[in-house]
Amino acid sequence: MDAGSSRSLENAVNRIYHDQLVPKINTSKKMSTLAHPPNILEMSQEIKKNCGGKQVEITLERTKMTKGIKEKQSNDLEKAAFKRKAEGEEKPTRKKQAKITELDNQLITMPLPHIPLKNIMDVEMKLVYIDEMGVRYEFVESFMSTGSQPTCQAAEIVDPLSVHNFSFLPQIDKWLQVALKDASSCYRQKKYALAAGQFRTALELCSKGAVLGEPFDAPAEDIASVASFIETKLVTCYLRMRKPDLALNHAHRSIVLNPAYFRNHLRQATVFRCLERYSEAARSAMIADYMFWLGGGREESISKLIKLYWQAMIEEAITRAESFSVMYTPFATKIRADKIEKVKDAFTKTHPAYAEYMYTDLQALHMLPQTVDWSSFPPQQYLLTLGFKNKDDGKFLEKISSRKLPIFTEHKTPFGLTREDTVRQMETMGKRILPILDFIRSTQLNGSFPASSGVMEKLQYASLLSQLQRVKEQSQVINQAMAELATIPYLQDISQQEAELLQSLMADAMDTLEGRRNNNERVWNMIQKVGQIEDFLYQLEDSFLKTKKLRTARRQKTKMKRLQTVQQR
C-alpha cells in the first residue's frame, strides 16, 4: 500500500474515532528473588470537549460496567479470602515456581525457567488466532445487559450472517457484511494480502457510516465494537504475512476502540513479541490477564495461558537487557528504610557488576505472573530493585519518580534546542529512558497518573520525532499512547481532574494524528514546559543558596583574619 492510500486510510479510521467515539526464547540470564510473603496543570477544557469527550465518556461508561463486575467478584471472594488468612498466611503456595524464604535469610539465586518457543506459539494459536473460520465482532455491553458471563469467546461472538439467532445483537450494514464475508473467505484460503485489502475496504465503509443497519440510532459503543473487530482482523492478517510493523498501529487502534476486551491486549502483546519489544509485550499480556478477570472470565485454563505468555515476555526482557539487572522482593508489610537497605545489600552481593547505581521503585508495587491472583486482597506484591552498570543509565529514575510533572531534559537551555540537541535528546529518550520505563511497567499494573504512567514520556518523545519530521514513528508512538490512555480508567480509579487531563491528552493526540493545528499548544508540551520552568527555578534557588553560603564563609574568614591581626598587634 502506497503512502498516499495509507494516509487516507489512517484519516478514515481517525474520523471513526472523532465522529463516533470521541476518543526463539532464550532464558539464560538470572533473576534474583528475595522473599518474605509479603497540583496537575490547570487548563481550560472547553476547546477539547467536542474533540475528545465521547471517547472518555465511553471509556468511563465501560469502566463503571466492569467495576461493577469487579465489586461483585470481590464480594463473593471476600469471605474465602479472610478465611484463608485466618487459617494462616504462612501456608506455601503449591504452584509457585520460585522458592520463598525469609528476607533476613540467605538470598536464593536461580536461573529463570526456560519456556520453549513452541509453548508461546501454542498460546498465540489458542488465544490470538482463534475463531478464524467466522466473521465475528465485539459487543461487550450486550452480554452485560443479558446477564450472561463472557466465556473464552466472550466478545468475538457471532457471524453476521447468523446474527438473527441473537436478537439482542445489532444488525450490521449489509454492504459491510458482504465486505467482511469476502475478507473472511480470503483469510480462510490463506490469501492474507487479499484479506487485508478487504478488511481495509470494510474499515473505509465504517468511516462513511456504513456500520450498523440503523446508523442514526446506533450507539457509538456498538460502532466502536465493529471497527475494533476489523482492526483486530487486520492485525491477524499482517501477523500471518509476517509484517508485524504493519500490524502495530491496528493493534493500538483496536484497544482505543474497545479497551475492555482482553484479546485486543493479547494481540498487541503478540505484535510486540514479533518486533522483539518484550517489555511492552509483557505489559500487554499482564493487562490482558487482568481484563479477562475483570470482564468475568472464569476459565482458569485461559488465565494460565495468558500468565505463561506474560512470564515468558518478562524473562526474555530480562535476558535481553544489557545495561541493568533486576531483583523482585516479595513482602506483605510496610516498607521500612532498613529493609530497603537490606535489599540493596543483597542485590550488591548477587549482582556486583550492576551495583554502580541502584534504584528501588517505591512509587507502585509490582506483581509477577507466577504468583498473581487478581481476586485476592491484595495480590502478592513485590518491591522492584534495578541495578545499573553505568550510573548515567539509571540516575534519571530518581528525578522522574520524585515529581508530579513527568519531564526529562539534559540541556541547560531546553527551550532553544538545536537540531543536534533534539537528535541527542530523542536518542536518549528512545534508547535509554523509555526501554527502562517500559520494563518497570511490565509488572506494574497501575502506577499513578500521569506521573508514573509512562504515557506523558511517550507523547513528549513523539514531539521530538515530530520536530525531526519522523512522521511514521511519531504516528506509532501516539497511537500507542492513545491505547494506554484508553486503558487507564480500567486499571485504576481516577479523579475528576485526572479525567479532564486524560480527555485533553486524548483529544490532542487525535488532533496530532489527523494533522490538525490550532493556536493552543499540545497538553504534554505545556506540562513539559512547566516542569522545565520548575527545574530552572530550582537551579536558580540552588545557585543562590550556594553563592550565599560561599559569601557568608568568605565574610566569616575575613572577619577571623581581622580579629587575628588585632590580637597580634
Curated annotation (Swiss-Prot):
A GO CC term attached to the entry: acrosomal vesicle
What InterPro entries would the database entry show? SPATA16, TPR-like_helical_dom_sf
Q: What keywords are assigned to this protein? A: Cytoplasmic vesicle, Developmental protein, Differentiation, Disease variant, Golgi apparatus, Spermatogenesis
Pfam families per UniProt:
NYD-SP12_N
Compositionally biased tracts (Basic and acidic residues):
67-92
Tissue expression as described in the entry = Expressed in testis.
What does the function comment of this entry state?
Answer: Essential for spermiogenesis and male fertility. Involved in the formation of sperm acrosome during spermatogenesis.
User: Is Glycoprotein among the key words of this record?
Assistant: no
Origin organism of this chain? Homo sapiens (Human)
What family name appears in the similarity comment? Answer: Belongs to the SPATA16 family.
What SUPFAM superfamilies does its record include?
TPR-like
Region described as Disordered = 67-96
The UniProt record's further free-text remark is: Association analysis reveals significant frequency of a synonymous (Ser-225) sequence polymorphism among clinical groups with different sperm traits: the donor group, which has the highest sperm count and motility level, has a significant higher polymorphism frequency compared to normal and asthenozoopermia groups.
Q: What is this protein called?
A: Spermatogenesis-associated protein 16
Its BP terms in the Gene Ontology are: spermatid development; spermatogenesis
Q: Where in the cell is it found?
A: Golgi apparatus; Cytoplasmic vesicle, Secretory vesicle, Acrosome
Which disease is given in the protein's UniProt record? Spermatogenic failure 6: An infertility disorder caused by spermatogenesis defects. The most prominent feature is the malformation of the acrosome, which can be totally absent in most severe cases. Additional features are an abnormal nuclear shape and abnormal arrangement of the mitochondria of the spermatozoon.
